[in-house]
Regions:
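Conserved N-terminal segment of class I S-adenosyl-L-methionine
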Residues: 2-118, 122-126, 250-256, 260-263
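Glycine/Thr-rich phosphate-binding loops of Rossmann-like dinucleotide-binding domains
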Residues: 89-90, 133, 162
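Residues in and immediately flanking transmembrane alpha helices
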Residues: 94, 110, 122, 143-144, ...
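GHKL-family ATP-binding catalytic core of two-component histidine kinases
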Residues: 114-116, 133, 173
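Residue-level recognition of oxygen-bearing side chains
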Residues: 120, 134-137
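Short catalytic micro-motifs in class I SAM-dependent methyltransferases
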Residues: 127-131
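S-adenosyl-L-methionine-dependent methyltransferase catalytic module, highlighting the catalytic core
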Residues: 136-137, 141, 147, 151-262
């Protein structure tokens, strides 16, 4: 580290004037003047969300794909996790997010990234594109910052209900994912199921009971959702059958894609 600058500071585009260093973190100037306030969530509710209801990132398929990509990241290469949340995947992964926290390196606004063109070997996006109003622009920006041959791991939902973060715009089928990647610029290496049809059914069933309860009183939505998140948890075990199902692409909870930058 040079002064208060991290080792990856050399990757930043010198012409990126909308960004400002504060100690060892990089902030978009709009993120400084208009800080993003994440809704407060109790510890118990957060544990239920992360480890029971919305545990997409912990699935065997997701862990296997990401572990392989991170193992192949060389010691002189860098990656970026766009929409990193509260977890650091690897020591050479730069965490990018809307809001600041101890593990975030770049606090951004909009869909622009501060990195120089052709500077990253890997980009990661887990359950993020559905929250962006213009996902095609994000894909183009990721393409810009990746080196030729660089890879993009993109994980998106399909059969799950609305969830603000702070907004929710899109759901993606296998064909929808293919449309995100212009074949003139990308080679789609793999499209897989991140969580299967058991999770898809589970998420919709939990919402069914929670939304129905809210017809009695709005305050019943959250406790009903919490209760049925636990009661219906065995439905997720049907995901074990998804890889063997001939029609597995019809109702998975989500999909992932690994795409390689061509030019």
């Amino acid at each position: 580290m040079e002064g208060n600058r991290p080792d990856w500071a050399s990757l930043i585009d010198a012409s990126a004037t909308a960004w400002e260093w504060r100690d060892n973190r990089l902030y978009h100037k709009e993120a400084i003047s208009e800080p993003y306030h994440q809704p407060s969530v109790g510890r118990l509710r957060r544990m239920l969300l992360d480890h029971v209801y919305a545990a997409h990132n912990a699935s065997r398929a997701v862990r296997g794909a990401l572990d392989r990509l991170l193992r192949e990241l060389r010691t002189d290469e860098w990656a970026a996790n766009i929409g990193a949340g509260v977890k650091r995947l690897h020591s050479r992964v730069i965490n990018v997010d809307l809001h600041d926290s101890e593990v975030i390196d770049v606090v951004t606004r909009g869909q622009k990234l501060p990195f120089a063109s052709n500077s990253l070997a890997l980009a990661i996006s887990q359950e993020v594109l559905e929250h962006l109003p213009k996902p095609f622009e994000t894909i183009r920006e990721v393409h810009r910052v990746l080196k030729p041959g660089g890879r993009f791991y993109c994980q998106v939902p399909f059969v799950i209900g609305y969830h603000h973060g702070p907004h929710d715009y899109w759901r993606f089928t296998r064909e929808g994912i293919e449309q995100l990647f212009n074949p003139d610029h990308w080679t789609v290496q793999q499209i897989g199921i991140s969580v299967g049809h058991g999770t898809g059914f589970y998420r919709i069933a939990v919402e069914f009971f929670a939304v129905t309860a809210s017809a009695v009183h709005r305050s019943l939505y959250i406790p009903t959702k919490a209760a049925f998140s636990i009661l219906l948890l065995p439905l997720k075990f049907a995901d074990l059958l998804t890889p063997f199902a001939a029609e597995r692409d019809r109702s998975p909870g989500g999909n992932f894609c690994i795409a390689v930058k061509r030019t």
